[in-house]
């Protein structure tokens, strides 16, 4: 199995899996993200205790890429401090813009590395970054 097949499989698994797609009870933060160009629409909900992201989940609809990206991001940020989560977001967005190519710097992204070449499909970039921008907005506005 080649790397592209593994990446495609990971995206499909996360987009179909419901383990991060559910409403949270009494979230501390709730932020809606919308991509008007393709209709992706998510609401990201986060519980924070002592500056640590204790729990996160999302609800909404969208393409496989937006749904998988949201799920993978949530797996990454759970248990991290808010600052660590924002560092991960910044690294992810820099990777998407091809500003980072150093493999060691990208290790922090774990499974989200599957989106590294999404910029080769410009119409899909907004799908991949929706949850990440939504997280940034959620934290800024809280």
Task: Please place each PLM-identified region on the residue numbering.
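Domain-level signature for proteins that mediate thiol-based redox and metal-cofactor handling
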Residues: 1-142
């Amino acid at each position: 199995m080649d790397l592209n097949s593994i990446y495609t499989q990971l995206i499909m698994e996360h987009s179909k899996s419901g383990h991060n797609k559910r409403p949270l009870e009494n979230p501390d933060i709730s932020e809606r993200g919308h991509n008007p160009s393709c209709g992706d629409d998510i609401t990201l909900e986060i519980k924070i205790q002592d500056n640590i992201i204790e729990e996160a989940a999302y609800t909404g609809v969208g393409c496989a890429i937006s749904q998988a990206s949201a799920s993978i991001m949530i797996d990454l940020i759970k248990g991290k401090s808010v600052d660590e989560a924002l560092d991960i977001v910044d690294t992810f967005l820099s990777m998407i813009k091809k500003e980072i190519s150093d493999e060691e710097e990208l290790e922090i992204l774990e499974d989200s590395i599957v989106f590294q070449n999404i910029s080769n499909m410009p119409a899909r970039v907004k799908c991949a970054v929706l949850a990440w921008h939504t997280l940034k907005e959620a934290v800024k506005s809280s």
